[in-house]
């Protein structure tokens, strides 16, 4: 009996010790955290940025007339040499605060004809899409005998991709003052994926060629459609080339690599130029096993995954884009960086017109197009519909200026929303063949400008502003790209090439003015009436 009592005592002591340890190490720290105000770790500016962004968003919501630029997700981590603005630590913020970037970009009240989508119709369409996805996902789980505790997807009206679609109007893909773009970039960067698949054009071409006849490394086209937990979609282009590598001089433009960092940088440049014609694009490090292989229902995509001799998980696309494993992309061992470009509204909701570029290049090894041999080619273009409308031609010239800055020779088509008619803006899609060679400036890309000798006054004013030291293009691009998770997105030679190419554009315009006169070359737009005191540079300087 005394032995049993001792055992009970030892048991009680042991239980008491365990209870005391639980109180001391688990419950008491939680009570302390509740009673003590939260302290922010030294050197962590996250809380300040979050409250600042919240205040900016609240200000924009309470006063629709107040223009608040929400382009910068974070403050730059470093201050580059020569990158400080007089009286300000940010050239990018100073640029967006300039009067040129604050002129009214649209009438105070947009009519239904000025918005791309009718909101109620779009929401009904998206609800049907979500319901259909839930049904198909349920059927797939039943067929594969899979169990899942995840609830069915719900369409959230406040989802950033929904608000992005509803915000597209005849002036651009998004407004300067819209806080939606920053939220969309953040969501694409962090939201988990729920499905992965080939793009529609790749599906249409699967098996449509004989892989033995492929004579080029066609894997450069590999891209996937990723869907996120909020039902948003993005085009994923994986890293194919290191940032410090240049396109070989013997490569034709139509077999060049598609670079994920070029897509990211093109979005930032388009925003800095105030075009707003490139869909929001962000960099992300993707786990190819968990975020692609394990969520895809496409058996063909599942079949092209393999483990390399270095134990890295790789995948490749089927013919005609890729036929061999040496053209695969590989994680390290699972992680792979790439670009994510937000999808535009479905063609069922917002039909788009794909138009051949009048300055399209010859996609043969030796041929040349008429514009390459005829310096008066633009005179012919001006007589042809729809380019006898100067606005369409001016938009093509804007596109050529953009392509020259990024070094993109592969602009064979452009797209437009049919709703906005002939005067609608051109969408600058597929920019992954830009930023290939920083050491070479392809002057032929500027042929629309040099042959037509026309430019929008608004475009010229922005270019001249970016040529000034306080707003130098390379500096604001460097600062803007620091916002991306994959920073540095561009190497320093590519950034400096932007300044060099900008000067080439301005010299081309100056030569046109000398030859034809300022009134003939510079086409006045609304910017002249809306911002007469916006600090324009001398047009002939």
Curated annotation (Swiss-Prot):
N-glycosylated. Changing residue 173 to R: In AI1G; impaired folding of the protein; abolishes ability to activate FAM20C protein kinase activity. Residues 49-63 have a biased composition (Low complexity). Disulfide bonds join 314-330, 319-323, 378-452, 453-512. Changing residue 258 to E: Able to hydrolyze ATP and display some protein kinase activity. Residues 1-33 form the signal peptide. GO terms for biological process: biomineral tissue development; calcium ion homeostasis; enamel mineralization; positive regulation of protein phosphorylation; response to bacterium; tooth eruption. GO terms for molecular function: protein serine/threonine kinase activator activity. Residues 38-90 are annotated as: Disordered. One of its GO terms (cellular component) is extracellular space. The keyword Ribosomal protein does not apply. Changing residue 403 to N: In AI1G; impaired folding of the protein; abolishes ability to activate FAM20C protein kinase activity. Belongs to the FAM20 family. Interacts with FAM20C; probably forming a heterotetramer of 2 subunits of FAM20A and 2 subunits of FAM20C. It is linked to Amelogenesis imperfecta 1G: A disorder characterized by dental anomalies, gingival overgrowth, and nephrocalcinosis. Dental anomalies include hypoplastic amelogenesis imperfecta, intrapulpal calcifications, delay of tooth eruption, hypodontia/oligodontia, pericoronal radiolucencies and unerupted teeth. Pseudokinase that acts as an allosteric activator of the Golgi serine/threonine protein kinase FAM20C and is involved in biomineralization of teeth. Forms a complex with FAM20C and increases the ability of FAM20C to phosphorylate the proteins that form the 'matrix' that guides the deposition of the enamel minerals. This is Pseudokinase FAM20A. It comes from Homo sapiens.
